[in-house]
């Protein structure tokens, strides 16, 4: 091999530096009609380096120095690279590693230029050359990089298990090396660097740890695709931790990934972890700076794009906070409700104390492994966490309200219809959950009225042709809201009245809410009909239960309408019977539907037997009075 200080070797190093510059810097400025111009030039230089290395090798063989790196591997060589073999720091091992490195860079080059088969061939050549060496500080970085690249390549072909194999081998190489050696390993670029330009130990460590961070990131994606969500979350969390520790991250991208990870924890009821991820996301997103003013954004296309990206990603983080608040309230409700779904205040105090003790113990055991941040950011994250409410902790709505405002500001109705409606539905769900904790029935009713005010205008304005499913959701929710308000008003009236007779104002309000609920349930049912208004003979699975429940609710609502006119009362009872009969007859014609509405079917069957008697008595009374 040529001396590291010889002119020949300096020429090789210069070519490598030029190839790196073409790949990493010059390629960014390639014209649209020649998108790979710089990378093709880099490929030519890498090919020349490969030829030079082979010529050095031949020269050494002719002079009798060293075993050629193309000989078969020594017996006993392990598949993962550990075991007996040519040492990584031997001349033959170094030659093989240098040739393998060029194969690696050629492989990446071909993949980048969309020549995947050629790229795979070069990367596998790299793997085969490294099989002739035991893993050492001089080649462990290359061992990991090439398997990372093969993992990415096979994942792109949807060969997830093949990808998994390469990435898990990279992981085991790292862990074994750190256990057996742990010294800062040689970076691949140093194979082609003159002695005076070698990296410091600190920079070597940073690059090596970053390569392993990439391994963990890719494994997180692999496990997610394999449906191993718990392992995927663990690897994702570790990746985010390492990115912060190495100071190698884009603030907004990191923040969005942390916020997304919080959603996994929330669905598992791990609110401490979810809260920590969201607090970290909020703090780190602040490192991206403020969005440019609207005036500045209008003057510069780059500033306009940056403003849009910052606003969008912060709005998406806000939506993740919204989900935290909603899920927290809903899970708290499950813990605190009594047998009829009302707040059990005695149990609330008992469970608050028990849960706080439990949370303290859990946090002591789990939090040390979870923490994000450096000295600069940790205090800010911890401070924000303390301001956010937790399971059974007194409710603080400032974070949640701010999140709704931020999300609505970006996801406006004009241009983001689906997102805007989903945020409104979440806002409605927030008030529904809060109403559970409100003991004042009048205030609880006002909370439900806020939900109506949010949803009703949008529901009526949405185009039924393009947003049919969304309108159905909103119509059903509005029907349920009015139904809840009706029950609350009746309970209030009964509490306040001196006798069992309701005054005219209360009756009018009750009937208005009852009719509004029936109207929206009927709108939902009408949306299932054909354009000619024909009721479907067979209900699709996704609307089967909602449709039958809507029928049952409409029947119940018509029977509850208060009327002083016997003829109007008779008309309402006839309509009620008609809807009860539909539920019973549909389930008789489609036995498989009965399991989806067991309670409603049982009550409908009972009412189909009782209502005709009530109708006949009313008719008889009307006949006598006439």
Where do the language-model regions lie?
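Extended alpha-helical scaffold/coiled-coil
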Residues: 1-626
């Amino acid at each position: 091999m040529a001396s590291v200080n010889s002119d020949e070797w300096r020429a090789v190093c210069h070519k490598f530096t030029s190839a790196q510059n073409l790949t990493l810097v010059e390629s960014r400025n390639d014209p649209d009609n020649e998108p790979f111009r710089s990378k093709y030039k880099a490929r030519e230089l890498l090919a020349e380096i490969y030829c030079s290395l082979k010529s050095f090798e031949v020269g050494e063989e002719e002079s009798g120095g060293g075993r050629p790196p193309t000989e078969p591997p020594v017996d006993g060589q392990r598949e993962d690279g550990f075991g007996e073999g040519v040492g990584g720091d031997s001349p033959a091992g170094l030659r093989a590693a240098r040739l393998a490195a060029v194969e690696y860079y050629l492989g990446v080059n071909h993949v980048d230029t969309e020549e995947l088969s050629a790229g795979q061939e070069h990367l596998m050549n790299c793997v085969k050359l490294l099989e002739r060496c035991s893993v050492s500080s001089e080649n462990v970085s290359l061992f990991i990089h090439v398997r990372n690249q093969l993992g990415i390549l096979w994942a792109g072909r949807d060969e997830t298990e093949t990808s998994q194999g390469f990435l898990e081998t990279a992981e085991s190489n790292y862990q074994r090396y750190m256990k057996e050696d742990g010294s800062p390993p040689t970076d691949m670029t140093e194979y082609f660097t003159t002695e005076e330009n070698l990296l410091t130990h600190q920079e070597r460590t940073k690059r090596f740890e970053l390569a392993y961070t990439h391994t963990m990131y890719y494994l997180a994606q692999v496990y997610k695709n394999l449906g191993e969500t718990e392992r995927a979350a663990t690897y994702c969390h570790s990746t985010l931790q390492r990115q912060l520790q190495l100071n190698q991250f884009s603030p907004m991208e990191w923040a969005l990934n942390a916020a997304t990870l919080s959603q996994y924890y929330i669905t598992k009821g791990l609110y401490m972890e979810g809260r920590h991820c969201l607090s970290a996301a909020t703090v780190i997103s602040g490192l991206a700076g403020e969005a440019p003013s609207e005036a500045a954004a209008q003057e510069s296309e780059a500033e306009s794009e940056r403003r849009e990206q910052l606003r969008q990603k912060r709005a998406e983080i806000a939506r993740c906070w919204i989900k935290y608040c909603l899920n927290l309230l809903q899970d708290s409700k499950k813990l605190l409700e009594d047998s009829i779904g009302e707040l059990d205040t005695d149990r609330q105090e008992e469970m608050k104390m028990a849960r706080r003790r439990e949370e303290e113990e859990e946090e002591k055991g789990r939090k040390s492994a979870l923490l994000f941040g450096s000295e600069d950011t940790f205090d800010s994250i911890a401070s924000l966490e303390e301001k956010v409410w937790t399971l059974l902790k007194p409710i603080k709505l400032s974070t949640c309200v701010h999140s709704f405002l931020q999300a609505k500001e970006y996801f406006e109705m004009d241009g983001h219809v689906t997102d805007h409606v989903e945020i409104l539905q979440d806002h409605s769900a927030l008030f529904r959950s809060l109403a559970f904790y409100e003991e004042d029935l009048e205030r609880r009713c006002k909370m439900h009225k806020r939900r109506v005010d949010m949803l009703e205008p949008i529901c009526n304005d949405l185009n039924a042709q393009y947003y049919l499913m969304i309108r159905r959701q909103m119509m059903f929710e509005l029907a349920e809201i009015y139904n809840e308000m009706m029950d609350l008003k009746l309970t209030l009236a009964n509490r306040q009245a001196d006798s069992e007779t309701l005054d005219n104002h209360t009756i009018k309000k009750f009937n208005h809410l009852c009719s509004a609920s029936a109207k929206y349930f009927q709108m939902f049912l009408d949306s299932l009909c054909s354009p000619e208004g024909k009721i479907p003979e067979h209900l699709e699975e996704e609307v089967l239960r909602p449709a039958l429940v809507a029928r049952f609710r409409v029947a119940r609502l018509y029977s509850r309408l208060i009327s002083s006119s016997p003829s109007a009362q008779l008309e309402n009872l006839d309509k009620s019977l008609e809807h009860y009969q539909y539920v019973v007859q549909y389930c008789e014609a489609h036995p498989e539907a009965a399991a989806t509405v067991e309670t409603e079917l049982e009550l409908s069957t009972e009412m189909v037997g009782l209502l005709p008697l009530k109708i006949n008595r009313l008719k008889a009374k009307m006949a006598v009075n006439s």
